[in-house]
Amino acid sequence: MSLSRISLALALVLGSGVTLADDPDQAIRQTLKSLDASLPIEAIAESPMSGIYQVQLEGGRQLYTSADGQFLIQGYLFQVKDGKAVNLTEIEESRAVAKQINAIPAKEMVVFAPKAPKTHITVFTDTDCGYCQKLHSEVPELNRLGVEVRYVAFPRQGLNSPAAKELVSVWCAKDQQEAMNRAKTRQSVAEATCDNPVAKQYQLGQMIGVNGTPAIVLANGKMIPGYQPAPQLAKIALESND
């Protein structure tokens, strides 16, 4: 089911047999599962707002519910601290994304690293994407500024597209960096096949909300959709370590 910020929210079932006197976790799960048995609930916990629970879905997305699961809130939860509105939802979603992205084994990515990296970015990329090619041309500058670039595959036209086939060839090349360089400069890449993570990475991208390339994930899990010039991107990436 495509949640797209949860259109199911406004159709909650009012007849759940679980009451507030029961375990809220059980009540919330029962009500949400009655809407969609395949809803990917990963965790339920009390939110900072009294009486409201936060539901973490697969991919890091957050929902908010009453303790009995009968009321569902869609959108962002803010907390005012020192006169500023802090987006708690964005923080939680970024934290969940960071946990998944930073757990990808290095051997499953194509990595361009400086000698002494200060931070890293993970880039969902496609080989025939113009802005992906532009970003790749600035990887040496990003490395010079201390940013390690980790590529994961995201064929925009799907797993049966020519770009997906080329991404597989890049991941299966003996020299992945050289193959990536060739692909990003519109040169031919020798066709190759092997056991590869392209499909898995594509599915991960869909799960966390990637819908175009390049999609850049900072070390803290915050996502930047689209190309950013190297100096600006490096500044944002380095600040994400704070």
Regions found by a protein language model. Name each.
Residues 1-7:
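Bacterial N-terminal signal peptides that target proteins for export
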Residues 8-14:
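Hydrophobic helical h-region of N-terminal Sec-dependent signal peptides
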Residues 15-19:
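N-terminal signal peptide c-region/cleavage motif recognized by signal peptidases
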Residues 24-111:
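Extracytoplasmic c-type cytochrome modules immediately beyond a signal peptide or single-pass transmembrane anchor
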Residues 41-42, 52-57, 61-64, 68-85, ...:
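Thiol/selenol-based redox catalytic cores and closely related redox-interacting motifs
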Residues 112-133, 148-149:
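Short active-site neighborhood of thiol/selenol oxidoreductases, capturing the structured segment around
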Residues 117-120, 145-150, 176-179, 213:
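Loop/turn elements at helix/coil->beta-strand transitions in domains of secreted/extracellular proteins
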Residues 153-155:
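Residue-level recognition of beta-strand->loop/alpha-helix junctions
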